[in-house]
Amino acid sequence: MLLLLVPVLEVIFTLGGTRAQSVTQLDSHVSVSEGTPVLLRCNYSSSYSPSLFWYVQHPNKGLQLLLKYTSAATLVKGINGFEAEFKKSETSFHLTKPSAHMSDAAEYFCVVS
């Protein structure tokens, strides 16, 4: 069984006091069996068109960018088989992978900019 840590965090950015953004990761810990699908949920709030990112941090390593959304296609493909779908109507940017591997055990961070 794999344990994917998704820190419960809410990040709020205020730029000039008029444009506030926040992101909320809904799961604090996600456990999956190797070979099964992974879903890491992220919802955001933004007063304008956001740029959204998913980062991963493996034990004793620095942050690594998995993928980013910057207003192009709604389905974003990242590294190592991860992808995320931007759903403006649901204000979500959930990270998915069809088949988890032991090497995916790490902390994952959703960021809005």
Curated annotation (Swiss-Prot):
GO BP annotations, alphabetical order: adaptive immune response
Q: Which residues are glycosylated according to the annotation?
A: N43
Q: What is its main location?
A: membrane
Gene3D superfamilies this protein is in?
A: Immunoglobulins (2.60.40.10)
- Domain Ig-like per the UniProt entry, residue ranges: 21-113
Q: Which InterPro entries match?
A: Ig-like_dom, Ig-like_dom_sf, Ig-like_fold, Ig_V-set, TCR_variable_region
Q: Which UniProt keywords apply?
A: Adaptive immunity, Cell membrane, Disulfide bond, Glycoprotein, Immunity, Immunoglobulin domain, Membrane, Receptor, Signal, T cell receptor
Which cysteines bridge via disulfide bonds? Answer: C42-C110
- Write down a Pfam family by its short name: V-set
Coiled-coil blocks? none
Intracellular or extracellular location(s): Cell membrane
Task: Report which superkingdom the organism of origin falls in.
Answer: Eukaryota
Q: Which residues form the signal peptide?
A: 1-20
Q: Which GO terms describe its cellular component?
A: T cell receptor complex
PANTHER family named among the record's database cross-references? T CELL RECEPTOR ALPHA VARIABLE 8-2 (PTHR19367:SF21), T-CELL RECEPTOR ALPHA CHAIN V REGION (PTHR19367)
- Described purpose of this protein according to its UniProt entry: V region of the variable domain of T cell receptor (TR) alpha chain that participates in the antigen recognition. Alpha-beta T cell receptors are antigen specific receptors which are essential to the immune response and are present on the cell surface of T lymphocytes. Recognize peptide-major histocompatibility (MH) (pMH) complexes that are displayed by antigen presenting cells (APC), a prerequisite for efficient T cell adaptive immunity against pathogens.
- Quaternary arrangement and interactors, per the entry? Alpha-beta TR is a heterodimer composed of an alpha and beta chain; disulfide-linked. The alpha-beta TR is associated with the transmembrane signaling CD3 coreceptor proteins to form the TR-CD3 (TcR or TCR). The assembly of alpha-beta TR heterodimers with CD3 occurs in the endoplasmic reticulum where a single alpha-beta TR heterodimer associates with one CD3D-CD3E heterodimer, one CD3G-CD3E heterodimer and one CD247 homodimer forming a stable octameric structure. CD3D-CD3E and CD3G-CD3E heterodimers preferentially associate with TR alpha and TR beta chains, respectively.
Q: What is this protein called?
A: T cell receptor alpha variable 8-2
